[in-house]
């Protein structure tokens, strides 16, 4: 059975790049009636935190990316936290050492740094120089007796080519002479990503590894490990990374935020999944799609090789589409029951049909609740100046027109046009700002029907002051 996986490190909060990788793996699995696996790669003891671990799982559940295998869903391949799998890795280290495919390395970080510097100055790519590659058993024991703790390096074969088919990028070829022997166990005994990631994919039956292109150069190393241990090799697909509009790595200055922050600000999970699913993947439909529909339309061949540019406006577009299709009960659960409680029952439906297409976040709903039912508006300086420049007569005539015609906006506007000889923006804008505090928004005629007559009178009187 097809099995994809998402394996974050709990060293920070989930960001958009993580979320997109998780989403693509989820959609890939669902498109093939496969299994989506979650594994927590927490071998970085110093930086890994339980709060981040739980936060990552909470974010995935909020996005409705439920895993069929992983923490809380053991299918016999656990544990699913790498910090609890060290005995498994130690067994494979022993196998590699016994087969002379790995050897202890006593080089200090200072020695390695100097070696890299010399190689770069000679115009060569930095790789391990092989200082400890041919140490005898006696030399190894002597160094250990001196109290030196070795790392363990994988012995990369010379003069070979590692070839694999990437589902996104086609055939990939790497010369082993360019790779160099690499560390598979740190001197402190812990396992780095390179090793345990590959071992776990094989042991957990992962058939497809879909990950960022920043892992592309890790793949030949992991293939060498799996081949040396005669373990199953998954199919790889390396997706383009998300970048800012200027092509630089995505950051907060581009408007990128963590999933928790987006959730706290009122973004909806379906908005995020619709945006992220299209960020580097083509969908024929430009309609808001459910997760099941996104999965049905997902195809690895539709993934772009080019970097995907983050666009905050596009994310907000999908947010607005998602809000607009929310059932009324879900809308108020999202916006907040305390806001709903401020709306008279007989005006609830009219408020929703009028305001819903114009809001994207709970703060927008709060704004229009205050417009329709609040006592005062907080005008910006420019708006106050516009009302002053309009002059009191405009608002006095508007006051009289509402007394005469009630909430018939067309008649009120016709009255102002006739009395003041106005048209266009000078005719409509002052009235909208005086009544709503906004230059744009829901249809004014409908907002007026929602407002109490007293509210309309008070705001016109305030505009005269």
Swiss-Prot record:
GO MF term (any one): ATP binding
Short sequence motif named 'KMSKS' region, residue ranges: 249-253
Name used for this protein in its record: Glutamate--tRNA ligase 2
Quaternary structure and interacting proteins, as annotated: Monomer.
Motif ('HIGH' region): 8-18
Catalytic activity: tRNA(Glu) + L-glutamate + ATP = L-glutamyl-tRNA(Glu) + AMP + diphosphate
Binding site residues for ATP: 252
EC number: 6.1.1.17
């Amino acid at each position: 059975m097809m099995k994809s996986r998402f394996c974050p490190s709990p060293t920070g909060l989930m960001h958009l790049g993580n979320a997109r990788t998780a989403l693509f793996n989820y959609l890939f699995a669902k498109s093939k009636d496969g299994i989506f696996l979650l594994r927590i790669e927490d071998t970085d003891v110093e930086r890994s935190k339980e709060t981040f671990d739980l936060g990552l799982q909470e974010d995935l559940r909020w996005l409705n990316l439920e895993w069929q295998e992983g923490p809380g869903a053991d299918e016999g391949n656990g544990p699913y936290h790498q910090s609890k799998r060290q005995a498994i890795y130690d067994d494979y280290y022993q196998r590699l050492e016994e087969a002379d495919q790995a050897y202890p390395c006593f080089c200090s970080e200072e020695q390695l740094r100097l070696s890299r510097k010399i190689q770069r100055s000679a115009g060569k790519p930095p790789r391990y120089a092989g200082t400890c590659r041919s140490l005898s058993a006696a030399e190894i024991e002597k160094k250990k007796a001196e109290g030196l703790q070795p790392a363990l390096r994988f012995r990369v074969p010379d003069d070979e080519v590692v070839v694999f088919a990437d589902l996104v990028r086609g055939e990939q070829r790497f010369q082993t002479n360019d790779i160099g022997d690499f560390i598979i166990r740190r001197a402190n005994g812990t396992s780095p990503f390179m090793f345990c990631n590959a071992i776990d994919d094989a042991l957990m039956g992962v058939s497809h590894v879909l990950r960022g292109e920043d892992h592309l150069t890790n793949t030949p190393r992991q293939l060498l490990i799996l081949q040396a241990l005669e373990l199953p090799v998954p199919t790889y697909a390396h997706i383009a990374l998300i970048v800012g509009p200027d092509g630089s790595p995505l950051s907060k200055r581009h408007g990128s935020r963590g999933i928790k922050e987006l959730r706290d600000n009122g973004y909806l999970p379906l908005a995020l999944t619709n945006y992220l699913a299209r960020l580097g993947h083509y969908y024929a439909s430009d309609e808001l799609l459910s997760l099941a529909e996104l999965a049905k339309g997902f195809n690895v061949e539709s993934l772009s090789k080019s970097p995907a540019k983050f666009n905050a406006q596009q994310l907000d577009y999908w947010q607005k589409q998602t809000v607009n299709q929310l059932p009324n009960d879900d809308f108020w659960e999202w916006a907040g029951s305390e806001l709903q409680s401020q709306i008279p029952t007989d005006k609830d439906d009219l408020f929703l049909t009028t305001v819903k297409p114009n809001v994207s976040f709970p703060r927008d709903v709060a704004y229009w609740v205050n417009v329709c039912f609040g006592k005062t508006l907080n005008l910006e300086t420019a708006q106050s100046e516009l009302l002053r420049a309009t002059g009191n007569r405009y608002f006095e005539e508007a006051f009289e027109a509402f007394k005469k015609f009630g909430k018939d906006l067309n008649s009120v506007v016709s009255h102002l046009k006739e009395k003041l000889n106005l048209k266009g923006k000078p005719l409509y804008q002052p009235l909208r700002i005086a009544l709503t505090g906004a230059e744009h928004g829901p249809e004014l005629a409908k907002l007026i029907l929602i407002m109490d007559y007293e509210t309309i009178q008070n705001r016109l009187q305030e505009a005269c002051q």
